[in-house]
Amino acid sequence: MTHIENIPHILQNGITHTTSEYANPDFVPIGDGSLITTRNNFILNNGTRLGEYIPFYFGVRTPMLYVVQNGFNLVAPTSAENIVYCVSSVQKIIDLQLDFVFTDGHAVDGFSSQYTVADIQNIDTILDKNAINAKYWKDENDLDKKRRKEAEFWVLGDISLHAILGYITYQRKCKKQDNHLWCRCYQCSY
């Protein structure tokens, strides 16, 4: 998920890291800065830093989207019209032979486990798809639901434009740039 103002750069360079030679000099951040710092320094089981990876959620309507839109945790609110989901797939990342890890919950939560390409054949049993697809994550009968809803897929390094299958935004009016339609209309706002 990214700010709509980052899309022109993504269309030219793919999704890039701040340390990439192709990094967006005009990057517009969204999200909790303190969490981003924590993630950047979090060491994965394979010895790499989580900050070296590009994050994806498995579902929409995530707690992060809620925080970004509503401005909690010292995060400035960003309107739904300015938020874009960059969509890829596990299969596409595998086909492009990109290195990745995935988690069964929020990546920096101590209860979450990390998995690699060696575990991918079991992804359907590892992930809790009911929690991932749930509209609400607060559940008095399941206090771990929010963590599982935030299961993540992390791709190492920059992601080329070829790995991006589409874009989802709340906007009803799609835009064209360089003769490519770059947003699909879909309502996933809170």
Segments from the language model and where they lie:
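Active-site-proximal loop/hinge segments that shape catalytic or ion-binding/gating pockets
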Residues: 1-190
